């Protein structure tokens, strides 16, 4: 069930290839797993951090490529230990989109120039509409709830170009 406690965090959905789920997406609890750390502090390319669906590998690539000074957010996620879980990572672009789609905190309009996600389960082939996705039914993720996303852009672990990551 979307928003239900699971694996040290909360179940946010599934990601897959060709409509077949490959893994669950779990978001960490706000109290210990949310950060405003910079994605990257250098204008250099990161070898390998370009997957739209493999946040663990992107995060590992960033950690291997540089120190916490260069990749503060990736190191924060990689080093996180909460509720007995130590396998946290920055979500890849399409993983992050699933989180937004399923855990959208507000009833406000969406940006209608995004939303296509061939890796979501089920896959989404069209952009958002002003009302889709709708506000999540998971109360703790609704505006004012203890786990609600703040109104801001969130970095993904997917590098767009040297020094720039993709955000949702």
Regions found by a protein language model. Give the residues of each.
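An exposed tryptophan-centered "aromatic clamp" motif
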Residues: 66, 74-87, 93-168
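Short, compositionally biased
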Residues: 1-85, 102-105
């Amino acid at each position: 069930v979307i928003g239900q406690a699971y694996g040290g965090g909360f179940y946010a959905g599934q990601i897959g290839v060709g409509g077949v789920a490959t893994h669950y997406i779990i978001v960490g609890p706000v109290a210990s797993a949310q950060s405003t750390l910079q994605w990257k502090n250098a204008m250099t390319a990161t070898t390998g951090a370009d997957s739209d669906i493999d946040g663990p590998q992107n995060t590992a690539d960033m950690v291997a490529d540089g120190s916490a000074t260069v990749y503060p957010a990736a190191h924060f996620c990689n080093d996180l230990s909460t509720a007995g879980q130590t396998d946290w990572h920055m979500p890849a672009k399409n993983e992050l989109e699933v989180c937004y789609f399923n855990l959208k905190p507000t009833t406000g309009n969406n940006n209608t120039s995004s939303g296509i996600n061939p890796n979501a389960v089920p896959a989404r082939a069209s952009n958002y509409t002003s009302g889709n996705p709708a506000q999540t039914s998971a109360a703790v993720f609704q505006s004012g709830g203890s786990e609600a996303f703040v109104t801001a852009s969130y970095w993904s672990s997917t590098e767009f170009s040297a020094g720039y990551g993709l955000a949702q």
